[in-house]
């Protein structure tokens, strides 16, 4: 009954991944991002991650696999997803939703830390403000974006962009794969410490 639709969806996902893989700069950006994160951890820094909706879940997934585990047991790495409900509701109410991530970065971000901002459109105002706050703190910035990078294009030290202009779920599928590869590479870098 739905075999054609299922095949179509899987083929579109495979095509999106194939297009991402064609650009060697994406592979280089993933490697540079992993090394940047591992270097921050080795120097006593941490990563703060943020996103909205499904990207918020990806930010949480990234942090939990760093503090918990990915495939193998190892020491936890300092990662915080900006996801505390009381913080989010307080700042949304008192300052506006555009400030939910930047206020947290202002409070706990330090020079040597890294911000990972995830936005499929690249146009999330609250992540743009978080990037500005991270810059003011002397933090490095990595972004996972999609389409043409939106307003976030060019704002990060390292941008990993999925150049897909269809539905956001295709971009998110590549983002989660990139997140898993980042963690795998971070683990390899950390054993070099």
Swiss-Prot record:
One GO cellular component term: cytoplasm
Chief site of localization: cytoplasm
Keywords attached to this entry: Carbohydrate metabolism, Cytoplasm, Isomerase, Metal-binding, Zinc
Pfam families membership: SIS_2
Key word Transmembrane helix present: no
Residues reported in the UniProt entry to bind substrate: 52-54, 65, 93-94, 119-121, 124, 172
Necessary cofactors: Zn(2+)
GO terms of biological process kind: carbohydrate metabolic process; D-glycero-D-manno-heptose 7-phosphate biosynthetic process
EC number: 5.3.1.28
Molecular function terms from GO: carbohydrate derivative binding; D-sedoheptulose 7-phosphate isomerase activity; zinc ion binding
Protein role: Catalyzes the isomerization of sedoheptulose 7-phosphate in D-glycero-D-manno-heptose 7-phosphate.
HAMAP family (alphabetical): GmhA (MF_00067)
PANTHER family per the UniProt record, alphabetical: PHOSPHOHEPTOSE ISOMERASE (PTHR30390:SF7), SEDOHEPTULOSE 7-PHOSPHATE ISOMERASE / DNAA INITIATOR-ASSOCIATING FACTOR FOR REPLICATION INITIATION (PTHR30390)
Reaction equations catalysed: 2 D-sedoheptulose 7-phosphate = D-glycero-alpha-D-manno-heptose 7-phosphate + D-glycero-beta-D-manno-heptose 7-phosphate
Keyword Metal-binding: yes
Organism: Yersinia pestis (strain Pestoides F)
Binding site for Zn(2+): 61, 65, 172, 180
Enzyme class: isomerase
Family: Belongs to the SIS family. GmhA subfamily.
Cell compartments where the protein resides: Cytoplasm
Pathway as given in its UniProt record: Carbohydrate biosynthesis; D-glycero-D-manno-heptose 7-phosphate biosynthesis; D-glycero-alpha-D-manno-heptose 7-phosphate and D-glycero-beta-D-manno-heptose 7-phosphate from sedoheptulose 7-phosphate: step 1/1
InterPro entries documented for this protein: GmhA/DiaA, Phosphoheptose_Isoase, SIS_dom, SIS_dom_sf, SIS_GmhA/DiaA_subfam
Other information: The reaction produces a racemic mixture of D-glycero-alpha-D-manno-heptose 7-phosphate and D-glycero-beta-D-manno-heptose 7-phosphate.
Quaternary data: Homotetramer.
Boundaries of every SIS domain copy: 37-193
The protein's name: Phosphoheptose isomerase
Cofactor note: Binds 1 zinc ion per subunit.
């Amino acid at each position: 009954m739905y075999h054609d639709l299922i095949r179509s969806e899987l083929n579109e996902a495979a095509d999106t991944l194939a297009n991402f893989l064609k650009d060697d700069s994406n592979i280089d950006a993933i490697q540079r991002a992993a090394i940047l994160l591992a270097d921050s951890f080795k120097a006593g820094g941490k990563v703060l991650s943020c996103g909205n909706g499904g990207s918020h879940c990806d930010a949480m997934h990234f942090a939990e696999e760093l503090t918990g585990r990915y495939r193998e047991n190892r020491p936890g790495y300092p990662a915080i997803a900006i996801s505390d409900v009381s913080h989010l509701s307080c700042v949304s109410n008192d300052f506006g939703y555009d400030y939910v991530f930047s206020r947290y970065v202002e409070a706990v971000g330090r020079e040597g830390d890294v911000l990972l901002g995830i936005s499929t459109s690249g146009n999330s105002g609250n992540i743009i403000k978080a990037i500005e706050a991270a810059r003011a703190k002397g933090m490095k910035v990595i972004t996972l974006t999609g389409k043409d990078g939106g307003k976030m294009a060019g704002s990060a030290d390292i941008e990993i962009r999925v150049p897909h202009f269809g539905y956001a779920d295709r971009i998110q599928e590549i983002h989660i794969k990139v997140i898993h590869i980042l963690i795998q590479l971070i683990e390899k870098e950390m054993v070099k410490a």
